[in-house]
Amino acid sequence: MNVAQIIAAKRDGKILDDEDIRRLVAGYSDHSVPDYQMSAFAMAVYFQGMTTHETAVFTKCMVDSGERLEWPAGHTIVDKHSTGGIGDKVSIALAPLLACCGVRVPKISGRGLGVTGGTLDKMESITGYRTELKIDEFRSIVNKNGCSIASASKNLAPADKRLYALRDVTGTVPSPPLITASILSKKFAEGLDSLILDIKWGTGAFMKTIQQARELAELMVHVGNEMGVKTSALITDMNQPLGNMIGNAVEINEATDVLRGVGPSDVTQVVFALASRLLVQAGVHSNLKDSEHKLNQLIESG
């Protein structure tokens, strides 16, 4: 099928062949498929959805549109991703905390999407902090410091970078297949061993009901594990803002408060829940009790 036929097929609720999905993403990557056609496809997916297999193929094609990071043998590479919510500054505290546990966290983050603030926007409120890094520079920082938070290089999942911006202005943000493909394509391009997902639901999240969040979590975990990355998810409440501060600079302050042991209890609880489970999942600790004990030691010791 040509691109117009692919759009029409999805509009009518048909299941797309692998080759049709590959053709669409490849065309979008080389700019032979314009934004208006991809917008139409995104809206068709929003209303008709995708099967788990379609989503997995779409995700793989997004990864294959660019490079993948490679890491030295013997290092455990992990990451976390949140679907976003009001006041969500968890990643800013979580990445360095995980790095102190001996794993490496190459955190590729995004900008504000819909009503939620983006981690990159928050990090850029730190004077002199650069989020636009070349792949070699990003890799070097992670190898030296254990973690880095940066934007996706133009060579990492480039098709997603364009689609991510397109969804924000076309009313197609809250689509489980598109959310899954966007998040996981960036994560898989990082060269991860383990991934944990923070799927938020409620009035301040994209998923308004816990059932929607559960369905998204199941889809993402299935696709992630099918593609060879150990993947799990937590479903967390976003019916009220996370923490006490809303705004890029003040959320940085609140995240550092968590690392100093004086942060808001709700933010600290989410950080610890995600970190402890990810460390067990990655094989750093054998159980949650040991994992939580190590995290508490790190916070108390400064």
Region spans (language model):
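A glycine- and small/hydrophobic-rich beta-loop-beta segment
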Residues: A4-I15, V223, K230-G302
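Alpha-helix C-terminal capping segments
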Residues: F47, A93-P106, K186-G191, E226-M227, ...
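Active-site-proximal beta-alpha loop/turn segments in soluble metabolic enzymes
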Residues: A42-V45, D160-V169, D198-M207, M238-P241
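Functional cores that coordinate and move charged inorganic groups
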Residues: L195, I199-M238
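Glycine/serine-rich anion-binding loops at beta->alpha junctions
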Residues: T76-A99, V103-V115
